């Protein structure tokens, strides 16, 4: 008794790549929003708030496959990096470095949908 077995394979790699590429901007936007909140928390915890202007100025921008977080306040770099007379209070660095697992979780949650 002969058994005929046949199957057909279809390559969907291109579609999968397109789907993943289409999700990247939304993932980066979600990470940017989270990073903004984390930077605000870092500034507040460091007691680096006088008028609240720096804290209110924190924003993010998605550009291609990257997200940037920063401030347009002229004294932001001095707070972040310090000066010869003022100790650094790296709120932006900490907002990225201290929350890597949170950002990974955002990516994973989106990709599991």
Where are these regions (language model features)?
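Short, Lys/Arg-rich flexible segments
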Residues: 1-113
């Amino acid at each position: 008794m002969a058994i005929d077995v046949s199957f057909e394979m279809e390559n969907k790699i291109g579609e999968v790549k397109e789907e993943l590429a289409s999700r990247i901007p939304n993932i980066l936007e979600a990470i940017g929003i989270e990073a903004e909140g984390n930077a605000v928390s870092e500034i507040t915890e460091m007691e680096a708030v006088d008028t609240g202007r720096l804290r209110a100025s924190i924003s993010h921008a998605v550009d291609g496959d990257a997200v940037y977080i920063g401030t347009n306040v002229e004294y932001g770099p001095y707070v972040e990096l310090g000066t010869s007379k003022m100790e650094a209070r790296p709120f932006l660095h900490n907002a990225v470095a201290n929350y890597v697992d949170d950002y990974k979780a955002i990516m994973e949650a989106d990709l599991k949908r």
